[in-house]
């Protein structure tokens, strides 16, 4: 669905919403959560996605993680997928950092593959081949390990603070 609650055509990217007998009718005793999560009986999952040409649902990211760089909306998952294709990279997580002028800017935490070397400028040159200029991370930090949350999952939100950026 789009931001106005309209169902999008195949290929249109928006929030994944579900409805049916197997979907909860709402949160018990939590009117605020219900108002934020339900629209005309549709449960808003917080996931971003689209139906591909074969009719399969493709999850493209989480709405809370979308980076708003001067009004441009950037999926960190898209940036991750491009950077992960570089042979020197073992793991990557792209995330938002605060920017005085643009509101948010893109950063990426990179774990290099064993024995690999890669400079920030080499990675940016590589990314220019596959990403629009405004989607290339401004800040690239190389780390031995990407911090994880309490559940062991990589968490984009709050990563800038954990890395001191």
Question: Which residues are covered by each model-predicted region?
Answer:
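AMP-binding/adenylate-forming catalytic core of the ANL superfamily
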Residues: 15, 20, 25-26, 33, ...
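FAD-site-proximal beta/loop scaffold in flavoenzymes
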Residues: 41
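Short helix-loop capping/hinge motifs at secondary-structure junctions, enriched
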Residues: 5-7, 117
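Active-site loops of AMP-binding adenylate-forming
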Residues: 1-4, 30-33
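Active-site glycine/GP-rich loop and adjacent strand/helix microenvironment
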Residues: 9-10, 26-29
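General small-molecule cofactor/ligand-binding pocket signal
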Residues: 140-143
């Amino acid at each position: 669905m789009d931001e106005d609650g309209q169902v999008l055509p195949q290929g249109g990217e928006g929030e994944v919403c579900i409805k049916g007998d197997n979907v909860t009718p709402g949160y018990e005793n939590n009117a605020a959560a219900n108002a934020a999560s339900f629209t005309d009986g549709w449960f808003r999952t917080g996931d971003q996605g689209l139906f591909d040409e074969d009719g399969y649902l493709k999850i493209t990211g989480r709405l809370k993680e979308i980076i708003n760089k001067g009004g441009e909306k950037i999926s960190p998952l898209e940036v991750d997928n491009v950077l992960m294709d570089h042979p020197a990279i073992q793991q990557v997580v792209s995330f938002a950092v605060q920017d005085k002028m643009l509101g948010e800017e893109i950063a990426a935490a990179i774990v290099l593959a064993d024995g690999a070397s890669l400079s920030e400028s080499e990675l940016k040159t590589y990314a220019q081949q596959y990403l629009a200029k405004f989607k290339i991370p401004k800040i690239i930090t190389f780390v031995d390990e990407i911090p994880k949350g309490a559940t062991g999952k990589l968490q984009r939100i709050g990563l800038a603070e954990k890395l001191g950026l």
